[in-house]
Structure formats: C-alpha cells, structure tokens
C-alpha cells in the first residue's frame, strides 16, 4: 500500500484510551451525551481496525484518491475528537473533587458550577457524532472497499508484527568507535596525502566528493576531516543542503574558528607572563574543566558542535571581515557538506578568505556539475564515490546484521539469508544497512520468504539502483514497523537535516505526545528507550555519541531517510515544517505539529496562510526573528520546545503560562532569567527544561505542579545551580524546651504538606540544583521526594556539622533506600562527599555515581553497589589502591577520574602535592590490576597531569574498548598493546603543554599500531 497508516493508527489508539476514561467518569457527563460518546468510541474503534487491516494489505493494491481522502477524514475527526476530550479534561477538573464523598447536594452544586462548559462540550460532541456518521456513510457510498475484500494471500511484502516490548528492551551498553568507510582504505590514504601535501601550500585547494545519495560521501568527508584536522591551525565543519542560508553558514564557521582562537590565546598569554606560573596553570586547568571535564555539556542539536550564543551576537555585515582577520595568517581546513547548486558554492566561496598558508576545503555534493564547479583548477581534486563491489556489499551486510542482532554471541549471519537481499541494494551502503536491520529484526523469516520479498521489490531486476529503488527499499523497512514505531519514526521529521538529536530530549517528547505509554509493566521512560533501541537496531537512525553509561547520547537521521519520512509525514499531515533545508509545499489543512526552522535570508520562516489554531506541538530551530504566538490556541498546545531560540523574551513566559495543557516545556539555552509564579497553572506539565539559561531561582508555586516528572536546570559546564524555593516560619516557638528558652524559627521543607497534598510526588529527575549553608529547608524537603530517581547537585557549599549538612545527609540516605539510581554532587569544599562513606545504609540501587571535589577516599560502601554502571570520581583519589578496590564491581561500564573544579581553585602547590603524593603512594606509577573490571569498556582521565599508567597483564580490564585522556602534562601510557579488545585511545592535549608531553604523545601515536591512537591538538614539539 502507498498509503501512510502508522501515525493515524497510533493517534486512534491514544484517543480510544481517552474516550474510555471519559465514559468512566459518570459525574462529569451531561445526560444525553453518554450515548454520543459511546457511538464515537465504537465508530473510531472500527476505523482503527480498518487502518490496521489496511497496513497488512500487500503491495500493488491501491485505492487511489478515494481511499486517501477517506483516510484524511478519519485522521481529521480523530484529531478533532482528541482536542474536544482534552478540552473536556481541562475545563472540568477532577483532582479537587475526586476524593470527596459525594452527596446529593454536592452533586447539584458541581452540576450548576460546570453547567455552561458541559453544555459547550456536549454541543461539540454532538457535532462530532454527526461527522462520524457521515464519514461511515461516505465510505460505502463511494465504494471504498474493506481490506478483506482484497487479495491478502501474498506474503511478498513484510508485515508489521506484534513484537513484545521486552524484545525491544534487550540491549547492552555500547561504545561508538570511529568507523572507517567500507572499501575506501587506498582512496582514503591518497586523499589524506593530497590534503596534507606541502607542495600545494601556496594557496587554497578544494576537494570535491561527488556521489549518489546514501553512497557514503559524508562518511568519507568526515573521516578525512577527522584524520587531518590536527595538522591545521583552524578547522570548521558545516552542513548546507537545499535551502542555503549564507549568514547561518558564515556564523557557524566563524564561531568554531573563534572558539579555537580563544583557546590558543591561553598559550600566548603564558609565553608573555612566565613569572606568573601559578596563575597560568590554574587558568589552564579551569579552561580544561569548563570545556572538557566531567561537566561536559550535552550537544542536543547544533550539527556543527558550535556555541550558539556567539552566533547571535555577531554582526552579519562584519562577519566576513572578522573571518578574514581570524584566518589571514593561519592554515585551515573546512568541511562543507551537501552543496546543491553552483550558485550556492559561489556564494560560499565569496565569504571564504584566501591566503597562502595552505587552506583546504572539503565539499560534498550529489551532482557532478556542482563538484566540477567547486574544483575547477589543477590544484583542486574531484573524487567520485563509486558503489560498493559485491564482496564489499556482502561484508557490510554481514557486519551490519551482526551489529543489529540482540544477542552478544550473534557474530555470524544465518546461512538461510539469501544473497539476493544485499544484491538488490546495488552496492549502496544506505540500502544495505537498512536491509540488514530488517533481516536482523526478523530472525524467524524463512529463506523462501526473503526471496519472494526481493522479487516483489524489484521484479524487473533493475541495475544500477535508482532513487526509486532506494524508496522501495525504505518502504519495505518502514512497512515492517509496528504502528507505534512508525509514529515514533515519523516524529523525527521535526528535526532539521544533519541535526544531532539528543536521545533523552526525544524520549521526553515522545512521552509528552503520548507515543510511549506504560506497557507490559514497564514505565513510560523504559518503553521510550525500548522504541529507540528498535529503531537503532533497524539502522533507521545512526548513533553519533554514546554517553559514559553506554547508552546513545546523540544520533542523526540519514538525509535520504529524513527526506523519506518527511514525505510520509506531509502525506498524513503529521508534521508541518516551515523553512528548513528542503523546499516543502505548505499543507492545505490544519497544522497539528509545527517545526519552524530558519532558512535562507528569510529568518522569519513565514507561517502565512497556515491554520495554526490546532497546533499541539511547536518546535523552533535556529535564529528566527519571530514566532507567531498570537496565532496559536493556548488551550491546545502540549509540547513547546524553544531550545536555543534567542528571540524568547520575558513577556513570552506570561503567554506560555496560559498554555494550560502543556506537558513539555524546554527553554534551554535561551535568555530567560525568571520563571513566573503563574507556572503553577500548568498543572499537566511533566518536563521543565531550563538548563543553561539565566534562571537561578524557582518560584514557590513550582511545588503545585503535581504531575511534574523532570526539572532540569543549572549549567553543568559552569557549575551554576538552580535554587529551589524555601521559607521560614515568622513566629518563634515559645518555651519549647524544659529550659524555657525560645528556639529559632522552625524551618519547613520546601515541600511541606502545607504546600498541598502530594506536592511533586511524581518527580523523578531533579538536576542542576544548588545547596548552600542557607538551604536547610531545601535539604530537608528532598526527603519527601520518594519517587526521585536522579538527583544532581551542581553546586554544594556547606559546612560539616551544620543543620544543612545533617539534613542533606539524612535526605540522601533516605532517598537511596527509596530507589535513587543516579547521584551527582559537586562539593566545593569537599567536606560532604568525604563524609558519604560514613552513611550507615548505602544507596543500594545506584546505577550512576559522580563525586566531584577534593575527594580523599572512596566511600566504604562503594564495593557493595553491584548495580553501579557509571562511576565518575575526582582524580585526587587516583592511586593503584583505588583501582584495586573498584576492580570487583561486576557491572561497572565506565570509570572516569576527573580534575574537579573545586580542586582547581586551590593553590597550585596543593594541587601538585596531591598528584605527586598519589604517585608516591603507588610507587611512582598507577598499575591496573591484573584481574577484575570484567564489564569495563570506557576508561577516562581528565586532569592537568596524567601520571604514568601501566597495563602489565592482558587480563587487566579485559573488556576495555576505549581510553580517553585530556591533560596538559602526560607521563606515559604503557602496555596497551596487550589488551585484546582495546580499539581506540583518544588524547586531547591542552594548550601550553611542555615539550616532553608533546614528545610522549607523538611517540605513542607513531609507534602504536593497535589500538588506534587519535590526538586532538597541535602536538609537534
């Protein structure tokens, strides 16, 4: 079937649940409309069954415009009914009366109080019933046949099956390594030599990489960029695409180069101020921490990994001159991905400075003519990417299947999988990995079924593969998805091309949209994670970064996959994109989910002509000048994602507080400094993301949000925390003690029962808060958050023995017994984290622990936490003895030793003494124990000085895959060649490194064949 039914069926499924709940609320229904609601419920249930049957109809059966129009009517009435039900839930609140013991009098009072809104809703429901009747009649009147009348005996196409949610969930923590392009070893070596050829240093040279969409151009260009970037003084990468925006491209390049310039200025300052060695070292340490230590911020969007704020503060008219000044006397390399026209290249070239320092530009394009325009000179180079050979295709197919399988021991491909599957892909990597994901997720499918599938997809056996052929393959993979996963996949079309999408951000949005609900005993969060794992296994999304817990941190959607799902979303009116990288036709019907993206010279992303009155979800990307808040119906919007939008003003927050059904609100990295007290009106709010804003205090009314699940605040990079509300009783307590003395005013927890019954009981994540000496009420209030699963304190500055100290210790101990899974504390004076070991009851459910500060010793109970997966502790406890204690932890996936911000504030001599004493305690070197660390895959060290580390036994950390180090001084890494599973070592050298450090780094890189050693930073001695 060509029709899109996934999102419609999922919408219907959610709606039927709401109708069922409404029918159960007898007291809220007006006499006479129960029958109408029951009729609508039954009719929509039949429509849902029709849609489900429709999704299983074999390919080749199409009803043309009649079926599409009828499905559009089903979709529209489903959306309108859902709006009506949501309005019903809001206008007839139940929380305040659900516990009341209803009497006849109370019932009459309630009916009188809600008479008018119930009448309005009754009228709307009656109209919807009439529409449902008309839609049902229209289907038979115009000959829209039932799916069972069609030939459904064919098994040629893959069908969506009812996967168990448990199957989605089975996954193990992983680390993303750096993968080389398949079949490109020789070519990569040649291109790498060309890019670094000293004979061409007299001027700018351009490498154009041309090829069919999905053939791997960006993969090759990115691999080259990564390999050679350390040999250039400046570097930047940017995505362009069809809707080219010169200002955006220029700002992105400028911000990346400016950031590098600011980093290099530290070295110049050091050379000019040799007498101020202590300050210099401290300054460098702080710089290292703010950029790259345990407080490394997530990148949830910007595809070029560039600071957003700098882009907003630059003057467009001055930017070309600024870029020319920055690059005038420097060698540079630029990666410009996905150029669509010669005009776009000419525009880009006009803003790039020319010098005689050997500038290199790598461009990718689908079009040979564009590639020739970009590389017209003899000093330039044009490389066309060919399709893979049969051997390369089979190797990629087999490798992808093994990576997509659930079980760890699934390291070979079943012999029953016919070779036709990878042969129909025509050597196109995107098609090959997509089909591999399909095969891996259908292990019970017989060989004959796969052969029939291949013949049905390509009965004409066409070669080479065309764009239509790629679409057929993607259709096949899409149609195999269950309805829930189809909806989740289509939702990704909200994000711009090339965007690095945060998995957590996406999961929270899925939950707010109602796409991931509790199922088979799993929470919404676990279901969302399971859905994402399934999309990853099917190779429909590409993980880009893994967090230190082994879960995907950020991912991307391949350009061709994004184009495909965007076309499906438009067909079903599921997502509407304004602006963006591609030219899209505006929908003629109502907009439900709006994605506004800056593009071209039009930063307003005009919504003229669109019906925005029924927008339920609004997302803003880029530097938009205007968002038409006045056009929205505040009573409908449930998801509002304004992350990084610098146009957000304080007055907008007042309007946002009128969006009474809002479930998800993100104003992360905006200029907002205050949250209005009226936020308490958002009684359905589940996620509040105010990270990296100027908001320092939450209003007292925040405790009225009974459904809030996640509060995300503060700035992990700068360790600025969010202050929770607190208050004191004004009247002193008279004669409370036998001595007859008057005590100080009694302190209440900020979540005291007087704030409202059940305040914030749903809260699961509280991240980025600040607790200081005056925060005893906050410390006491944490005790009441018994559902808390994550607590992150970005700033802790309290005195040992004080009231706040005792309250916090008591709260953490209690929360640990209630199921706390993640605990992160940045202790500025280190007294609290050093006292944690004395807790009588350890937090036995911990999965992740982060202790930042001048930690003196490990907590005594740490070896009893068998569930611990991620551990981040201060480098001040880096000793051989520490590793000998930790090596017995059975589930530990990542171990990080970091140089904490609090330690960096100490005198240089104290810092040096701590590190030197650690070495002496370990006999001059840190030796990794020969046994233990059975599950450890990631080992990291972030410090100004990394002492000598030695692996003396091949059984030391047997599962270790990646070592990361960031430092200014380095004393060597020995024995890594004997570690069988170690794949990569990443070294980041801070500015101002000594000659001996550069020598050791170069020696390690040059003389180590396995594992691969990657260096970030200029290390030529």
Swiss-Prot record:
Keywords tagged on the record: ATP-binding, Coiled coil, Leucine-rich repeat, Nucleotide-binding, Plant defense, Repeat
LRR repeats: 612-634, 659-682, 683-705, 785-807, 817-841, 843-865, 866-888, 912-935, 957-981
InterPro entries reported in the protein's UniProt record: Apaf_helical (IPR042197), Disease_R_plants (IPR044974), LRR_dom_sf (IPR032675), LRR_R13L4/SHOC2-like (IPR055414), NB-ARC (IPR002182), P-loop_NTPase (IPR027417), RX-like_CC (IPR038005), Rx_N (IPR041118)
Claim: Coiled coil is one of the keywords in the record: yes
Induction: By M.oryzae pathogen infection.
UniProt note on tissues of expression: Constitutively expressed.
GO MF annotation, one: ATP binding
Location of the region described as Disordered in the Swiss-Prot/TrEMBL record: 297-317, 719-751
GO biological process, one term: defense response
Keyword Oxidoreductase among record annotations: no
Region of interest (Structured coiled coil (CC) domain), ranges: 1-182
Sequence ranges assigned to domain NB-ARC in this UniProt record: 186-519
Pfam family, one: LRR_14
PANTHER family: DISEASE RESISTANCE PROTEIN PIK6-NP (PTHR23155:SF1013), DISEASE RESISTANCE PROTEIN RP (PTHR23155)
Family the entry assigns: Belongs to the disease resistance NB-LRR family.
Free-text function comment from the UniProt entry: Disease resistance (R) protein. Resistance proteins guard the plant against pathogens that contain an appropriate avirulence protein via an indirect interaction with this avirulence protein. That triggers a defense system including the hypersensitive response, which restricts the pathogen growth. Contribution of Pikm-1 is required to recognize the effector avirulence protein AVR-Pik.
Name the record gives this protein: Disease resistance protein Pikm2-TS
This protein's encoding gene: PIKM2-TS
């Amino acid at each position: 079937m060509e029709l899109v039914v996934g999102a419609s069926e999922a919408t219907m499924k959610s709606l039927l649940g709401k109708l069922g709940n409404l029918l159960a609320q007898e007291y809220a229904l007006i006499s006479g409309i129960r029958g109408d609601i029951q009729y609508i419920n039954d009719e929509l249930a039949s429509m849902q069954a029709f849609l489900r049957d429709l999704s299983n109809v074999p390919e080749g059966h199409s009803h043309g415009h009649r079926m599409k129009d009828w499905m559009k009517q089903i979709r529209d009435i489903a959306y309108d009914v859902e709006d009506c039900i949501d309005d019903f839930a809001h206008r007839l609140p139940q929380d305040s009366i659900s516990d009341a013991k209803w009497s006849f009098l109370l019932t009459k009072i309630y009916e009188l109080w809600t008479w008018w809104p119930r009448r309005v809703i009754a009228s709307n429901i009656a109209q919807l019933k009439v529409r449902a009747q008309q839609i049902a009649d229209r289907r038979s009147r115009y000959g829209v046949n039932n799916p069972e009348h069609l030939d459904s005996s064919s098994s040629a196409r893959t069908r969506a099956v009812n996967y168990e949610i448990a199957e989605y969930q089975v996954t193990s923590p992983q680390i993303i390594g750096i993968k080389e392009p398949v079949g490109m070893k020789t070519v990569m070596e040649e291109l790498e030599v060309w890019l670094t050829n000293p004979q061409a240093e007299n001027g700018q040279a351009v490498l154009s990489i041309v090829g069919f969409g999905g053939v791997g151009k960006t993969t090759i260009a990115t691999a080259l960029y990564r390999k050679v970037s350390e040999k250039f003084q400046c570097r930047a990468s940017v995505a362009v695409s069809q809707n080219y925006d010169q200002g955006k491209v220029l700002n992105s390049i400028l911000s990346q180069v400016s950031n590098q310039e600011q980093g290099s200025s530290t070295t110049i300052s050091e050379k000019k101020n040799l007498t101020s060695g202590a300050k210099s070292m401290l300054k460098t340490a702080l710089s290292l921490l703010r950029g790259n230590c345990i407080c490394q911020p997530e990148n949830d969007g910007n595809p070029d990994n560039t600071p957003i704020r700098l882009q907003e503060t630059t003057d467009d008219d001055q930017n070309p001159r600024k870029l020319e000044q920055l690059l005038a006397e420097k060698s540079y390399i630029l990666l410009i991905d996905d150029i669509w026209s010669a005009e776009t290249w000419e525009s880009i070239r006009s803003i790039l400075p020319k010098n005689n320092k050997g500038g290199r530009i790598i461009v990718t394009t689908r079009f040979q003519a564009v590639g020739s325009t970009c590389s017209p000179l003899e000093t330039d180079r044009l490389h066309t990417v060919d399709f893979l050979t049969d051997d390369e295709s089979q190797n990629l197919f087999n490798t992808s299947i093994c990576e997509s399988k659930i079980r760890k021991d699934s390291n070979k491909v079943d012999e029953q999988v016919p070779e036709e599957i990878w042969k129909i892909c025509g050597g196109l990597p995107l098609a090959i990995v997509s089909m591999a994901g399909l095969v891996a997720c259908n292990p019970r499918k017989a060989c004959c079924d796969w052969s029939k599938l291949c013949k049905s997809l390509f009965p004409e056996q066409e070669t080479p593969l065309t764009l239509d052929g790629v679409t057929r393959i993607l259709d096949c993979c899409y149609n195999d998805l269950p309805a829930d996963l189809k909806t989740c996949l289509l939702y990704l079309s909200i994000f711009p091309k090339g965007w690095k999408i945060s998995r957590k951000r996406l999961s929270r949005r899925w939950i707010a949209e109602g796409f991931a609900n509790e199922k088979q005993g799993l929470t919404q969060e676990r279901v969302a994670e399971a859905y994402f794992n399934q999309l990853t296994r099917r190779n429909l999304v590409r993980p880009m970064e893994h967090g230190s817990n082994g879960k995907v941190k950020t991912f991307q959607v391949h350009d061709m996959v994004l184009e495909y799902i965007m076309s499906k979303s438009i067909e079903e009116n599921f997502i509407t994109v304004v602006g963006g990288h591609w030219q899209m036709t505006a929908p003629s019907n109502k907009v439900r989910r709006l994605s506004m993206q800056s593009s071209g010279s039009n930063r307003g992303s005009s919504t003229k002509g669109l019906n925005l009155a029924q927008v339920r979800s609004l997302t803003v990307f880029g530097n938009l000048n205007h968002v038409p808040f006045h056009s929205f119906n505040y009573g409908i919007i449930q998801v509002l994602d304004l992350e990084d939008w610098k146009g957000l003003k304080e007055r907008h927050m007042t309007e946002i507080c009128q969006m009474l059904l809002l479930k998800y609100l993100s104003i992360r990295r905006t200029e907002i400094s205050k949250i209005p007290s009226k936020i308490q009106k958002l009684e359905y709010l589940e996620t509040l993301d105010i990270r990296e804003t100027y908001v320092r205090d939450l209003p007292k009314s925040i405790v009225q949000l009974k459904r809030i699940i996640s509060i995300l605040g503060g700035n992990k990079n700068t360790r600025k925390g969010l202050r929770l509300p607190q208050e004191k009783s004004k009247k002193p307590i008279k004669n409370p003690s036998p001595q007859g003395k008057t005590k100080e005013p009694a302190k209440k927890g900020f979540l005291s029962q007087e704030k409202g019954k059940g305040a914030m009981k749903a809260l699961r994540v509280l991240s980025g808060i600040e607790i200081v000496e005056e925060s005893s009420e906050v410390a006491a209030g944490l005790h009441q958050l018994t559902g808390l699963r994550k607590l992150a304190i970005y700033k802790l500055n309290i005195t040992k023995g004080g009231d706040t100290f005792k309250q916090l210790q008591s709260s953490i101990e209690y929360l640990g017994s209630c199921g706390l899974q993640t605990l992160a504390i940045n202790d500025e004076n280190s007294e609290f984290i050093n006292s944690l070991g004395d807790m009588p009851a350890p937090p036995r459910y911990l999965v992740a622990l982060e202790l930042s500060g001048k930690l003196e010793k490990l907590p005594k109970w740490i070896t009893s936490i068998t569930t611990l997966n991620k551990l981040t502790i201060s480098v001040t406890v880096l000793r051989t003895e520490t590793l000998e204690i930790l090596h017995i932890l059975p589930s530990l996936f990542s171990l990080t030793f970091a140089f904490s911000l609090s330690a960096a504030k100490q005198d240089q001599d104290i810092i040096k003494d701590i590190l030197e004493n650690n070495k002496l305690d370990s006999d001059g070197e840190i030796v990794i124990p020969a046994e233990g660390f059975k599950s450890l895959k990631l080992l990291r060290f972030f410090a100004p000085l990394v002492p000598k580390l030695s692996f003396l036994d091949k059984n030391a950390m047997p599962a270790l895959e990646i070592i990361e180090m960031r430092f200014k001084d380095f004393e060597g890494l020995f024995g890594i060649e004997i570690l069988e599973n170690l794949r990569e070592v990443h070294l980041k050298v801070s500015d101002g490194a000594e000659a001996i450090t550069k020598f050791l780094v170069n020696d390690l890189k040059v003389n180590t064949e396995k594992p691969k050693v990657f260096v970030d930073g200029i290390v030529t001695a």
